[in-house]
UniProtKB/Swiss-Prot annotation:
5-phospho-alpha-D-ribose 1-diphosphate binds at A128, N129, G130, D131, A132. Signal peptide: none annotated. GO terms for molecular function: xanthine phosphoribosyltransferase activity. CDD domains: PRTases_typeI (cd06223). The keyword Cytoplasm applies. PANTHER family: HYPOXANTHINE/GUANINE PHOSPHORIBOSYLTRANSFERASE (PTHR43864), XANTHINE PHOSPHORIBOSYLTRANSFERASE (PTHR43864:SF1). This is Xanthine phosphoribosyltransferase. One of its GO terms (cellular component) is cytoplasm. The lineage of its organism: Bacteria, Bacillati, Bacillota, Bacilli, Bacillales. It comes from the Bacteria.
Length: 192
């Protein structure tokens, strides 16, 4: 997705050779028009897969996920990082390690909102080592829901997340692939 790649190159801030900050349009302040295009692109890629729910994790995955849900005309369901007092019935849970925050969180999804009747598209803002997407896939499997694929806004292709997801048998669609952050510069993967 050319517009997204341009935004990543122009507005992304390289913190170090493994961390890219995109707070100006994705992770803190959200460019709604860009996220609408992200959602539309995921819809075009997965529209024939029978998607019944978009599944993501709070917080940064919500913006692209809700825009995808809007285009699919299905609910957006996000895994919570803390169990609210209002969640009194059953839930699915898994542990997810955040590469950026270097922190492991237990995330939960209410059994009320995810079941074997669902076909989910998992959406996440970043793909580094794949732990968040694999954790969401684990939750979908616990619910006996079908996973149609994984939609990633920005993939750090120099890390092993994409490979791990494919090894799990998942279809992965990354809209912007970063080849390198070396030399304090964003270099994108050139698609042929």
């Amino acid at each position: 997705m050319e517009l997204l790649g341009q935004k990543v190159k122009e507005d992304g801030v390289v913190i170090d050779e493994k961390i890219l900050k995109v707070d100006g349009f994705l992770n803190h302040q959200i460019d709604a028009k860009l996220m609408n295009e992200v959602g539309r692109t995921f819809y075009e890629q997965f529209k024939d897969k029978g998607i019944t729910k978009i599944l993501t994790i709070e917080a940064s995955g919500i913006a692209p996920a809700i825009m995808a849900a809007l285009h699919f005309d299905v609910p957006c369901l996000f895994a919570k990082k803390a169990k609210p007092s209002t969640l009194t019935d059953g839930y699915y849970e898994t542990s997810i390690h955040s590469f950026t925050k270097n922190k492991t969180s237990t995330v939960i999804v209410s059994k009320e909102f995810l079941s074997e009747e669902d076909t989910v598209l998992i959406i996440d803002d970043f793909l580094a080592n794949g732990d968040a997407s694999l954790g969401l896939y684990d939750i979908a499997q616990q619910a006996n829901a079908k996973t149609a694929g994984i939609g990633i806004v920005v993939e750090k292709s120099f890390q092993n997340g994409h490979q791990r997801l494919e090894e799990a048998g998942l279809t992965v669609s990354s809209l912007c692939k970063v080849a390198s952050l070396e030399g304090n510069k964003v270099t994108l993967v050139v698609e042929e």
